[in-house]
Amino acid sequence: MPTVLALETSCDESAAAVLRLNNGCLQVIASRIASQVEKHAQWGGVVPEVASRLHVEALPHLVEEVLQEAGQSMARFDAVAATVTPGLAGALMVGSVTGRSLAALHALPFFGIHHLEGHLASVRLAEHPPRPPYLVLLVSGGHTELIRVGAESEMVRLGRSHDDAAGEAFDKVGRLLGLAYPGGPAIQALAATGDSGRFSLPKGRVSKPGGGFHPYDFSFSGLKTAMLRLVQALSEADEDLPRADLAASFEQVVADVLVERSLLCANDQGLKTVVMVGGVAANRRLRELMSKRGQEQGIEVHTAPLRYCTDNAAMIGAAALQRLVSGVNGSSLELGVAARWPLDKTEVLYHSPPPF
């Protein structure tokens, strides 16, 4: 039963987990997350230098806690994994150095994991995970992408956001409405009492140079601007700001756009399964709408378990175990970190010399 210790420090969540593969099923033996949300809330967003310092403070304790809970000594692991890209460089370095050091000290393979590959693997932590091929809507604070996942770790991006990710749009609109950071949960709570049809908002589209639109791509900057102008107009008219209706209308149009383009892409690709992963995949309205419209179109919808939608180390361990059992020997201990790296080039993370 292959077992890994996994670390995640790509942004503002410090996390450690122990995972085991038992008869083809992933088992999360222990998982711990130290959130930095309260620390960053006073600035309305993540401060990279603060995030790095908090990772340094939290990660050793998290590793100790998961080892104790798992009742596992380092000698009994088959590998150590850590996120190495993409993310905040300083934050990534904390997890990467910790992971590589533990691997070197205990003569274990080290797996440098692409953060998005971790999100894609998070659905494998569900009780009944889907089998590829399928289309993944990866929707989080930093990413909004449509990715076809096939056998043998095949990952092909078919759609993306050309500006803000959906999660960024939630945060920015949340600030506009005077809500707490992060914006996603705050907007969802407020929208529950609002009228989602009160305000008409644009579904941003991305033009092609030769005319027409990219059918599977996203743009949320126009929606964000429309919300700003709407709030300004209501304020200038001395109206009481209908924050619940504004939140509900915004949440609805985001969900509509994500669902419509995901299902269009799946149908065009001949795929009968759509998977949702990432922090925004925890949004209740999005989950319900995708399930309803997917059922209407004969498309099966799977979502990563709620506790594994936001950043966590269990998904990093899941990705590492996939690589380990497929015969990958691991990454070089000289592998560094990169703030950006394309998902379709993850294979080179396991080559020598390392790409960065």
UniProtKB/Swiss-Prot annotation:
Reaction(s) catalysed (UniProt annotation): L-threonylcarbamoyladenylate + adenosine(37) in tRNA = N(6)-L-threonylcarbamoyladenosine(37) in tRNA + AMP + H(+)
Family stated for the protein in its record? Belongs to the KAE1 / TsaD family.
Q: What class of enzyme is it?
A: transferase
Which residues are recorded as binding substrate?
L138, V139, S140, G141, G142, D171, G184, N283
UniProt-listed Enzyme Commission number(s): 2.3.1.234
* Gene behind the chain: tsaD
Any one cellular component term from GO for this entry? cytoplasm
Which positions bind Fe cation? Answer: H115, H119, D311
Q: Does the keyword Disulfide bond apply?
A: no
Task: Provide the alphabetized UniProt keywords.
Answer: Acyltransferase, Cytoplasm, Iron, Metal-binding, Transferase, tRNA processing
Location in the cell: Cytoplasm
Cofactor(s) it depends on: Fe(2+)
Q: What is the lineage of its organism?
A: Bacteria, Bacillati, Cyanobacteriota, Cyanophyceae, Synechococcales
Chief location of this protein within or outside the cell? cytoplasm
Q: Output the CDD domains linked to this UniProt entry.
A: ASKHA_NBD_TsaD_bac (cd24133)
Protein name (database record) = tRNA N6-adenosine threonylcarbamoyltransferase
The UniProt record lists the keyword Transferase: yes
Q: State how the cofactor is bound.
A: Binds 1 Fe(2+) ion per subunit.
- Entry-linked PANTHER family: TRNA N6-ADENOSINE THREONYLCARBAMOYLTRANSFERASE, TRNA N6-ADENOSINE THREONYLCARBAMOYLTRANSFERASE, MITOCHONDRIAL
Tell me, in a sentence or two, what this protein's role is.
Answer: Required for the formation of a threonylcarbamoyl group on adenosine at position 37 (t(6)A37) in tRNAs that read codons beginning with adenine. Is involved in the transfer of the threonylcarbamoyl moiety of threonylcarbamoyl-AMP (TC-AMP) to the N6 group of A37, together with TsaE and TsaB. TsaD likely plays a direct catalytic role in this reaction.
Single GO MF annotation? iron ion binding
